[in-house]
Amino acid sequence: MRLAVNIDHIATLRNARNEGHPDPVEAAILAEQSGAAGIVCHLREDRRHIKDDDLERLREAIDTKLDLEMAMTSEMQSIALRVKPELVTLVPEKREELTTEGGFAIHTHFKRLTEFIKPLRDHGVEVSIFIEPEDDAIELAAEAGANLVELHTGPYSLATGDKQIAYELERIRTAARIAREAGLAVVAGHGLSVHNIAPFRELHDIEEVSIGHALIARAVLVGLPVAIQELLDHISR
């Protein structure tokens, strides 16, 4: 299982003083050197953490895979077509939220989504959709032309008690299997950390986990290479 590192909160820390450091690009390079298989960043409409210049520099600097999380807007589509990350992950976005709160409502936006994905695919950009681990969302993602789905693991990360944890884990396991059967690659993310990631070693249909906040929070205390190695130790099969 691969680890993709979300560097948004390196930018959050930098923006607290607007003095240019810590640099998200420097962090991305260090993450790659420490074993990350990809770098994730979310260019929000309000630019609350990652800025346009960060994205441009990341595109030039990293050697693995750049995953651009973004809303389904014409502005973001234009940016993605210009920058051409290896992967775009479409996420729902609300200005008032602290972080992405749930999966993309594909059934509500299916026609627009299909039209949005096509030019990205035509220009060599793979497309993932951040969804709840539900059968209908997976089927619609495949029909819309996505290459991948990222399963929302927030409910799992917030689950308490063995019964609820097992229930949420089984939802993810089943969704991952259905997605693979539909021809989609599978990523999982949101709220994952060294404290809850170990069971994912047994979810063989999931190829990659995307982790940001917990990893960066740990890195503040022990350093980014150590924080990444701790996670890699927990997900190695």
Swiss-Prot record:
Pfam families: PdxJ
Coiled-coil stretches noted in the UniProt entry, renumbered to this chain: none
Protein's UniProt keywords contain GTP-binding: no
Keyword Cytoplasm: yes
The enzyme's E.C. designation: 2.6.99.2
Sites where the protein binds 1-deoxy-D-xylulose 5-phosphate: D8, H9, R44, H49, T99
GO molecular function: pyridoxine 5'-phosphate synthase activity
Top-rank taxon, per record: Bacteria
Any one GO BP annotation for this protein: pyridoxine biosynthetic process
Primary localization class, coarse: cytoplasm
GO cellular component, one term: cytosol
Class of this enzyme: transferase
Catalytic activity: 3-amino-2-oxopropyl phosphate + 1-deoxy-D-xylulose 5-phosphate = pyridoxine 5'-phosphate + phosphate + 2 H2O + H(+)
Site entry: Transition state stabilizer: E150
Pathway involvement of the protein, from the record: Cofactor biosynthesis; pyridoxine 5'-phosphate biosynthesis; pyridoxine 5'-phosphate from D-erythrose 4-phosphate: step 5/5
InterPro entries, alphabetized: Aldolase_TIM, PyrdxlP_synth_PdxJ, Pyridoxine-5'_phos_synth
Keyword vocabulary terms for this entry: Cytoplasm, Pyridoxine biosynthesis, Transferase
Binding site for 3-amino-2-oxopropyl phosphate: N6, R17, G191, G212, H213
Subcellular locations according to the entry: Cytoplasm
UniProt-annotated catalytic positions: H42 (proton acceptor), E69 (proton acceptor), H190 (proton donor)
Family as reported in the entry's similarity comment: Belongs to the PNP synthase family.
Subunit structure as annotated in this protein's UniProt entry: Homooctamer; tetramer of dimers.
PANTHER family referenced in this protein's UniProt entry, alphabetically: PYRIDOXINE 5'-PHOSPHATE SYNTHASE
Function in brief: Catalyzes the complicated ring closure reaction between the two acyclic compounds 1-deoxy-D-xylulose-5-phosphate (DXP) and 3-amino-2-oxopropyl phosphate (1-amino-acetone-3-phosphate or AAP) to form pyridoxine 5'-phosphate (PNP) and inorganic phosphate.
The protein's name in its UniProt record: Pyridoxine 5'-phosphate synthase
Gene: pdxJ
